[in-house]
């Protein structure tokens, strides 16, 4: 299940050049679990674009931010300025519902 519909207090933190997603996720039994997931394990930077299945996007990003409920659909959007091969930075975003889900109170990649 997309994590955002079963999450509370979703946020990111950048620590030691890694971007970590945190939230309280509802388990199948209805209880809540404090969960975290290192987004650099599943998101990379491919010439200034987010790349699913890549790694370490934080190393070539600046101004990383997260909006847990953006727009009318209240989607969790990760935004950053990503460096391309020429050293230029570009504003990019990715909808985390497309790549991260809640499996019984734990974050899991969809691929």
UniProtKB/Swiss-Prot annotation:
SUPFAM superfamilies tied to this protein: Cyanovirin-N (SSF51322)
Gene3D superfamilies, sorted: Cyanovirin-N (2.30.60.10)
Family: Belongs to the cyanovirin-N family.
Protein name: Cyanovirin-N homolog
SMART domains: CVNH
Species name: Neurospora crassa (strain ATCC 24698 / 74-OR23-1A / CBS 708.71 / DSM 1257 / FGSC 987)
Protein function: Mannose-binding lectin.
GO molecular function: carbohydrate binding
Domain of life according to the entry: Eukaryota
Keyword Zinc-finger: no
Keyword line: Lectin
